[in-house]
Amino acid sequence: MLLGPRVRFAPSPTGYFHVGSARSALFNWLLARQSPEGCFILRIEDTDADRNREEWVDGIISAMAWLGLDLDEGPFRQSDNHERHLAATASLVAAGYLYYCDCTSDEVAARKGDNKTPGYDGFCRTRALSQSPTTALRFATPREGVTVVPDLIRGDVEFQNTTIDDFVVAKSSGAVLYALANVADDRHDRITHVIRGEEHLPNAPKQMMLWRALNEVSGDEVPLPVYAHLPLLVNEQRKKLSKRKDPVATESYRDQGYLASAFVNYLALLGWSPRGDEEIVPLSTLIEQFRLEDVSHSPAFFDVKKLSHLNGEYLRALSSEEFVDACAPWVAPQTTSWRPTDREVPWSDADFDPELFRRVAPLVHERVATLGEVPGMVAFFFLDELVFDEAAFDKVLRGDPLGQAMLAAAAERFAETSWDAASLHAATVELGEAMGMNLRKAQAPIRCAVTGSLVGPPLFESLEHLGRERVLARLRSALTRCSA
């Protein structure tokens, strides 16, 4: 007797791990974790040999581990269940549920003529063909009645059987297709809930027909699962997320420095809301409150700006030490077991000072939305050769004699000022007042000369951590650069 929900996440390894797939995996996992007897299964549906790649399999498993979606069973590969699929096919053929068809797509189209009704016309249904190298297998769909899909999100969804054509379940090569392979594996695994994207809703009545047929021919009355078809994820234009145009790869968000906890929190809010108005929802609360019946059937906007805001909140909730540790793959990847893909740190190991980073990390902790932003904000601490924002340099130094005068005065005053943020701030205020400049304008040429940019962490604390010698050298170098 099954005591808890048995759910499976069954992705096809044909590309990067889509954020929609990540949400489906999460919702399955949340349901399983609500019961001590719940079971979360990963089954890789890899029967499409022409499109599957092993690197995509690895990507799925790696991304799920990053998200913390631990497995109770699996990962299994659907291709390992080939004998099970063949046995299911043979039993359905013997019972008359399947028939052989040798029609080509051109022949089907020619018979239709001007009739634009989609689907197969059932031409081979009564021809009693035998298996051959040119015959596929089709399911003989009932010609009458209604198939009702019980959906926890959408209610009962009715499909007139006349609108469901005799669909192919096995190719002429003998390869068993998704519809039958999926049902055979779900029955074997005693799946109780099928939670997936709404694009799979048209498959549900076909799979229910196959499920009932297999129950009959096997004598094993496995209960049909309950379905839950999740709403589409849409972009800012409220169109379905495009794999080509929209940032949909889960791996890319990990590489950009989003925290797994923030990403999971955000995924959970795509179509579902917890009780209350809080955006930050602990995982324990997600598990406790999640109900498929509360998921909306309306499209959910995948808002990267909102995700970034939420991630920033999660980052700011980290302690200083936790933040430093979290930054390690982006600032010192050689010291970690994982590093972001195709993201090179802009300094060498020899230039990186872990202790200096520990001291300056609080300066950027409150200012970044992702960990991937950290290297750009602290690079000037570790690079001997600054990378200048040339437009900024032209604006406040090369093209501004007053900015150059301020820089020369700062180089002279900073040589004797007490080396702490407060003293450096006071000295800059005094120099600016003498030149008729407010603090914002007075510090701009100093910031650009020392950091290469007009934006970044607090200036005077940064100067303190850089040290007098490096700051004075950069001020003088910038003055020389102005006349170059």
Name each model feature, range by range.
Residues 320, 324-435:
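Small-residue-rich helix-loop
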Residues 267, 311, 361-368, 381, ...:
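Short alpha-helical scaffolding segments that buttress acidic/His motifs in well-ordered protein cores
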Residues 100-241, 249, 274:
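Active-site cores that bind ATP or allylic diphosphates and position pyrophosphate for catalysis
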Residues 7-13, 42-46, 189-195, 427-429, ...:
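Glycine- and acidic
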Residues 274-333, 338, 346-358, 362:
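Active-site-proximal acidic segments at structured loop/helix or strand boundaries
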Residues 418, 422-482:
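Charged substrate- and nucleic-acid-binding regions of tRNA-handling and nucleotidyl-transfer enzymes
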Residues 78, 171-172, 189-200, 234-266, ...:
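Conserved phosphate-binding loops in nucleotide/dinucleotide-binding enzymes
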Residues 1-118, 203-222, 262:
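N-terminal Rossmann-like or analogous alpha/beta NTP/dinucleotide-binding catalytic cores
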